[in-house]
């Protein structure tokens, strides 16, 4: 938690905006823009997706400030198990994607991609099953209840799923689906985009909580929610750079219990990053703070007009944070 909000000028003075090229289209984008803030405790990442309005993005700025200005919490483990992340690629590309996650025994597969079919999803999931023993899928709220019931049956015809992540958009839909299928349900957007992140569990709509540092407002906020949510937690990336991944690893390492692989291996989705990506070893990532490489910051710097867009965004989000600090 940020005890005192630093001056806006201090944030802008140490702000770096970068554009990271991606290996494949993910979440509909091929370049990931983030703003990085250097502070007395290290580096923080402000990477709210560009379509988010300031009211939603300000939590991401709070997270960046916390990481840059506050000491990290004590950790309980020095490495974190990660899942491979498989975008909505053709089945023939699955082997190439999984090769970036050496030793991973769990894979998260994107499904319900606009413009694709359930048959595409089945083919992709089954290709992953041939290479990785544990599979989970993420629909990003792309199905209605009836579609999700049908998809759950089709996707488990050739093997089990660890869970369905955010198969439907609303808590009510998740609760209904959970009553109708045997596959465990994980909630992501229903937690990180909700005014009340605990509502999904009170509604008995999820078996697992997927928590992300930046959208929830920082490491301390994530740990607070994890302590109160009463279901197992998976810490995941919000398509973070190496700086954001380090914050996610710290949060996962600080949890009292960690029963599932975490979605923190997404650095492999970038062609270039602000620091040398940590390579998974036997399916684990080491817990460590990350300092960007100055040469990479310069080489990956966003164009002037995009840098100004992020500066304006920081100012707008900062103004929304000020009232919280009296």
From Swiss-Prot:
Catalytic-site annotation from UniProt: 110, 212
Pfam assignment, any one: MR_MLE_C
Single annotated GO MF: magnesium ion binding
Known pathway: Quinol/quinone metabolism; 1,4-dihydroxy-2-naphthoate biosynthesis; 1,4-dihydroxy-2-naphthoate from chorismate: step 4/7; Quinol/quinone metabolism; menaquinone biosynthesis
InterPro entries xrefs: Enolase-like_C_sf, Enolase_C-like, Mandelate_racemase_C, OSB_synthase_MenC1
Signal peptide: none
Top-level taxon: Bacteria
Protein name per the record: o-succinylbenzoate synthase
């Amino acid at each position: 938690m940020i005890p005192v909000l630093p001056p806006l000028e201090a944030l802008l003075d140490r702000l770096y905006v970068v554009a990271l090229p991606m290996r494949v289209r993910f979440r509909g984008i091929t370049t990931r823009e983030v703003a990085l803030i250097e502070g007395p405790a290290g580096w923080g990442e402000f990477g709210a997706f560009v379509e988010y309005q300031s009211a939603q993005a300000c939590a991401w700025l709070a997270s960046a400030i916390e990481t840059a200005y506050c000491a990290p919490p004590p950790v309980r483990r020095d490495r974190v198990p990660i899942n491979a992340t498989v975008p909505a690629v053709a089945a023939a590309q699955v082997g190439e994607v999984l090769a970036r996650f050496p030793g991973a025994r769990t894979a998260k597969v994107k499904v319900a991609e606009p413009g694709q079919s359930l048959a595409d999803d089945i083919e992709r999931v089954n290709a992953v099953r041939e290479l990785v023993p544990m599979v989970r899928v993420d629909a990003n709220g792309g199905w209605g209840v009836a579609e999700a019931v049908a998809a759950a049956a089709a996707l488990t015809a050739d093997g089990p799923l660890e869970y369905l992540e955010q198969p439907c958009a609303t808590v009510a839909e998740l609760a209904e689906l959970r009553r109708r299928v045997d596959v465990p349900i994980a909630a992501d957007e229903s937690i990180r985009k909700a005014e009340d992140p605990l509502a999904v569990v009170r509604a008995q709509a999820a078996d697992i909580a997927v928590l992300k540092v930046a959208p929830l407002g920082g490491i301390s906020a994530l740990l607070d929610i994890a302590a109160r949510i009463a279901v197992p937690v998976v810490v995941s990336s919000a398509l973070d750079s190496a700086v954001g991944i380090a914050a996610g690893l710290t949060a996962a390492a600080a949890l009292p219990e960690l029963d599932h692989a975490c979605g923190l291996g997404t650095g492999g989705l970038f062609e270039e990053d602000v620091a040398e990506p940590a390579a998974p070893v036997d399916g684990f990532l080491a817990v460590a703070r990350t300092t960007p490489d100055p040469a990479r910051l310069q080489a990956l710097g966003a164009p002037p007009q995009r840098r100004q867009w992020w500066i304006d965004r920081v100012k707008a989000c900062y103004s929304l944070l000020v009232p919280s600090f009296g």
